[in-house]
């Protein structure tokens, strides 16, 4: 397992990425990750209050907050996404998680996508995850991966980094999906896991990827727990395909 930074107040390690989110999180020994989905997604301000109340009720501090899944009305421009993220991290800073600076620290994993139908009128929180003391000494490891789209690592602007930009042909989609799957595998390995540890695999796209599910996903073991396909777009204009994976210890609906 690669040596990853550890967010000690939250009892989880994380893949350092960009200021708005990490590449994924995994519970440290002696802890595990629980996931809660809201029965009805909540506007962010209400969601933050609900998260605080839930963590307080189970005896956990806000620093146990490890991941969230958001839904936005429509894909952002690069500047719009940056502005949204600047506001988003303010709550994480208040919770004692995010640290500003020349090299900002944000250990929290995140997925943010835009439903094609039943769009929210403002950004909402769909689900969140946090660490708790493990219920069993031999508890299996638990982790949450951030959402990842078909953009190579780089600067703030996405357009120049998108794989097969504006190409939604069968072969264009094949390359996009293959790129994202490779990135999911890389993150899993960094966290100390593999496809065999994944409990839930989720895809987000409005493009037809049916011809790729067997060949690219199931054949490599990415769908052992099935595939959850959300008819939604990634959060930035130009992106067509996003995925995330997780292996939570337990999941609840609130």
Predicted regions and their residues:
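Short, polar/acidic, helix-capping and beta-turn segments at strand->helix junctions
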Residues: 1-254
